[in-house]
Amino acid sequence: MSETQKENPYSSTVLLPKTDFPMKADLAKREPEQIRSWKQNRIFRKMREQRSGKKEFVLHDGPPYANGNFHLGHALNKILKDTIIKSKSLAGFYADMIPGWDCHGLPIEVQVLKNLGKKVRETGPEELRQLCRKYAEEFVGKQGDDLSRFLCFWDEGRIYKTMSPDFEAKIVEVFGELFKKGYVYRGKKPVYWSIDLATAHAEAEIEYYPHISPSIYVKFPIIGEKKRFCLIWTTTPWTLPANLAICFNRKIEYSIFKTESSEELILADALAENVTITTGVALTKLKPITSEELAALKFQHPFVDRISVSLFGDHVTLEAGTGCVHTAPGHGQDDYKVGLAAGLEPFSPVDDYGRYTDEFPLMQGKKVFDANPEIIQLLRDKGLLLYHGELEHSYPHSWRSKKPLIFRATPQWFFKIDFQDLREKSLSAIDGVRWIPSWGITRIRSMVETRPDWCLSRQRNWGVPIPAFTCESCGQTHIDDASIQFFTKMVREKGIEIWYSEETKDLLPPKTKCGKCGNDSFKKGNDILDVWFDSGVSNFSVLGERKDEPPADLYLEGSDQHRGWFQSSLWPSMALRGIPPYKAVLTHGYVLDEKGRAMSKSLGNGIDPTADIIQVYGADILRLWVSSLDFRDDIKVGKESLKIVSEQYRKIRNTFRYLLGNLDGHTPEQNLPFEELEELDRFYLSKLAGFVEDAVASYETYQFHQIYQKLILFCTVTLSQDYFDMIRDRMYCDLRDSKSRRSSSTALQYILDSLCILVAPILSFTAEEVWTSNGKKDSVFLQTFPDLKSWKNQSLEDKFESALQAREVVQKALEIARQEGKLGKSLEAALEIVSKSGLSFGELLPKETLELLFVVSQIHEENPGMEVLSSHENEKFSVKVLKPLQGECPRCWRHTEDISKEGDLCGRCKSVVA
């Protein structure tokens, strides 16, 4: 016999919780085994098969670059998507998401070139493409492993890669459809250009950083006037060799001003004072000059033997400068537009690597940024530099090289944004999309309203070639529907390598001739498609078509994708379908360190989701952290926040452990019908029903942080602090098969099952672990959210809540007695409770229920002559803690009125042990 049994011979008769479910989760070690089980049993496929024919919910996965391991931002994104898919499936939907990877483009090509090091010169284009494909394939595998380790569900044989032949063929096909409909054209326009990478950049590939530029005021001599000049201001001296005009605004008032050196300068009246303050040159107004007079002016280029003309444009403002704008149509969007209207061809004497060409022989071969000081000195030597300073401003940089970009006019392929009112149609369609958070619509509208034509072409090796040919006889570009369809079929069979491996004649339909001269000899183009076009047409390649509605129910990405993937997906879909590709768009913020700084290698503040979280805490802790966030805003994370989440997880796990322990020996077949349950149990099942309803609603609106908060409250307060405490005596000391104990066991079973299913989208491993620990054979993910609305009983809740209002007063009174050393356990107390409203507690709940509610041995509305140990009251209740006249039952520790002498069992315990 144990020491405990010697001390208390009844301990073996008490039904204490018993379970093999460990308190220590050991998630990092045990989760991989569960991942293997899910894969072997094809749980994700079974989830979909089980929901076949149900209402469909499709989340389209924006493809990450197959470049490097997943960082914490990726983990946030993928876990959010997985949580949504699981919650939608449990809500009864046929929920689906096919994970994808972006495999072409600069990020991969640049990394491969970097890895080659000195061998780069020995590597030809064909070998480079093979290395890029191999590199992308490697990281698809690594990131796929990361995805599984985040406990995300996906079928490994059911993914999309933008470098697969089928996908590449779809890219070419969609490009062809857009070309056929007139949305694609070739033209020479200024585009963002990386002189480090020698390629064009789209709007989505640009990042803005602080940059210091020269700030100069330059005098353009007026033809026919000896001492009269037009004053311009620029921060890009290197573009002056390409100047073809000076632009004014007809709505701005201009005048001729005289300097102390008797020179005359034309500039805007409203900016004269600013010019004087900046340059230190005093200006005296001589006379106004009209728009007609300005239009007649011609200007001598400051250092090139060329005449510049006068133009007018609304882009000229009074925000800075002189109101007279240096205009180089080959190096600026606005410059290009006004130049085009005036018949000026864009002129850009700069090559792919940012060096001046022989069109500016004075500095041929010089890099443009390096030329700035020389151009400034040239102006100074000619007496045409009024002022030279510096300006720090936000300047466009390449997202890949982090180096400044230039605007440069080159022949490129473009998507025509304003063709057939596409911009207006898209703006109208945006209004019909659900944007979460709501400010997303304002952000994307502002971008769509001002977006220039999309530059589709790139001058790189790794990507889908634009199927355009050049006639070797007359130089005409050849591209038509027949040639695109022919090439699409070839790509579908053999991949894009066919473009490089086959002879040009074999890439075109037989008997293809030049539409201009009739020649049949062509050469291939060298441009590839923007990688944003690849991902932008993924909804055509991956998703099934739906009649008159978008193919995706939801897009979910970081808020930076308003200018990226959300737009690159929108334009082709609007052009070809007439509708957006998505019904709703949900965005999340950036992951920052605990000080609100971006994570970077230089700061050393990065948190690796695998090494720093999963291998330390487990993936369920990572998922719980994600669920705790209001992710619509930027998110701060550090060791302290992860520690807090880990502690909250322990409380949730402890709740599950207590439930499982108390259900030892209980089977669902022993559950009582709901209507036969005790009132206390029905009250807490009503509370459960309310919690479930709220949680399901929060899943529906993607407000997972609300579920997290309510789950913690439900587990720690509603259950652990209240309900478990109230039924402990019943569960431990009642007869195992008594109706009272079965009532509570039934409630605990319902609570366990409901909580388990409810948290499964978030705590995927733990939910499955609890589910199987309770003897369930199938997966928790093959269930549906419980519908407990019929259990919701407001009148019952009102009745209990009235009684529970006294619990705070009771607990305070008990605490006073403990502090004074008069009381140990609450079961050593009896209570006198008086409602100041005159309401009798007996009218609300039976005395036995109140004793459970307050976890005391006896309840009295009037003291039957017991010693008062303490008292407390508020405006509603007065409570006295009494010392029971009876002794303590050695089995249940209660002091009940049926105990006749010290050491006797109470009547209930006598019947149990008999």
Curated annotation (Swiss-Prot):
<keyword id="KW-0030">Aminoacyl-tRNA synthetase</keyword>
<dbReference type="Pfam" id="PF08264">
    <property type="entry name" value="Anticodon_1"/>
</dbReference>
<feature type="binding site">
    <location>
        <position position="906"/>
    </location>
    <ligand>
        <name>Zn(2+)</name>
    </ligand>
</feature>
<feature type="binding site">
    <location>
        <position position="601"/>
    </location>
    <ligand>
        <name>ATP</name>
    </ligand>
</feature>
<feature type="binding site">
    <location>
        <position position="892"/>
    </location>
    <ligand>
        <name>Zn(2+)</name>
    </ligand>
</feature>
<dbReference type="InterPro" id="IPR033708">
    <property type="entry name" value="Anticodon_Ile_BEm"/>
</dbReference>
<dbReference type="GO" id="GO:0008270">
    <property type="term" value="F:zinc ion binding"/>
</dbReference>
<comment type="subunit">
    <text>Monomer.</text>
</comment>
<keyword id="KW-0963">Cytoplasm</keyword>
<dbReference type="GO" id="GO:0004822">
    <property type="term" value="F:isoleucine-tRNA ligase activity"/>
</dbReference>
<keyword id="KW-0479">Metal-binding</keyword>
<keyword id="KW-0648">Protein biosynthesis</keyword>
<dbReference type="InterPro" id="IPR002301">
    <property type="entry name" value="Ile-tRNA-ligase"/>
</dbReference>
<feature type="binding site">
    <location>
        <position position="909"/>
    </location>
    <ligand>
        <name>Zn(2+)</name>
    </ligand>
</feature>
<keyword id="KW-0862">Zinc</keyword>
<dbReference type="InterPro" id="IPR002300">
    <property type="entry name" value="aa-tRNA-synth_Ia"/>
</dbReference>
<dbReference type="GO" id="GO:0000049">
    <property type="term" value="F:tRNA binding"/>
</dbReference>
<dbReference type="InterPro" id="IPR013155">
    <property type="entry name" value="M/V/L/I-tRNA-synth_anticd-bd"/>
</dbReference>
<dbReference type="InterPro" id="IPR050081">
    <property type="entry name" value="Ile-tRNA_ligase"/>
</dbReference>
<feature type="binding site">
    <location>
        <position position="889"/>
    </location>
    <ligand>
        <name>Zn(2+)</name>
    </ligand>
</feature>
<feature type="binding site">
    <location>
        <position position="557"/>
    </location>
    <ligand>
        <name>L-isoleucyl-5'-AMP</name>
    </ligand>
</feature>
<dbReference type="Pfam" id="PF06827">
    <property type="entry name" value="zf-FPG_IleRS"/>
</dbReference>
<feature type="short sequence motif" description="'KMSKS' region">
    <location>
        <begin position="598"/>
        <end position="602"/>
    </location>
</feature>
<keyword id="KW-0067">ATP-binding</keyword>
<dbReference type="InterPro" id="IPR014729">
    <property type="entry name" value="Rossmann-like_a/b/a_fold"/>
</dbReference>
<dbReference type="GO" id="GO:0005524">
    <property type="term" value="F:ATP binding"/>
</dbReference>
<dbReference type="InterPro" id="IPR009008">
    <property type="entry name" value="Val/Leu/Ile-tRNA-synth_edit"/>
</dbReference>
<feature type="short sequence motif" description="'HIGH' region">
    <location>
        <begin position="64"/>
        <end position="74"/>
    </location>
</feature>
<dbReference type="InterPro" id="IPR023585">
    <property type="entry name" value="Ile-tRNA-ligase_type1"/>
</dbReference>
<keyword id="KW-0547">Nucleotide-binding</keyword>
<comment type="function">
    <text>Catalyzes the attachment of isoleucine to tRNA(Ile). As IleRS can inadvertently accommodate and process structurally similar amino acids such as valine, to avoid such errors it has two additional distinct tRNA(Ile)-dependent editing activities. One activity is designated as 'pretransfer' editing and involves the hydrolysis of activated Val-AMP. The other activity is designated 'posttransfer' editing and involves deacylation of mischarged Val-tRNA(Ile).</text>
</comment>
<dbReference type="GO" id="GO:0006428">
    <property type="term" value="P:isoleucyl-tRNA aminoacylation"/>
</dbReference>
<dbReference type="InterPro" id="IPR010663">
    <property type="entry name" value="Znf_FPG/IleRS"/>
</dbReference>
<dbReference type="GO" id="GO:0005829">
    <property type="term" value="C:cytosol"/>
</dbReference>
<dbReference type="InterPro" id="IPR009080">
    <property type="entry name" value="tRNAsynth_Ia_anticodon-bd"/>
</dbReference>
<protein>
    <recommendedName>
        <fullName>Isoleucine--tRNA ligase</fullName>
        <ecNumber>6.1.1.5</ecNumber>
    </recommendedName>
</protein>
<dbReference type="GO" id="GO:0002161">
    <property type="term" value="F:aminoacyl-tRNA deacylase activity"/>
</dbReference>
<dbReference type="Pfam" id="PF00133">
    <property type="entry name" value="tRNA-synt_1"/>
</dbReference>
<dbReference type="InterPro" id="IPR001412">
    <property type="entry name" value="aa-tRNA-synth_I_CS"/>
</dbReference>
<keyword id="KW-0436">Ligase</keyword>
<comment type="similarity">
    <text>Belongs to the class-I aminoacyl-tRNA synthetase family. IleS type 1 subfamily.</text>
</comment>
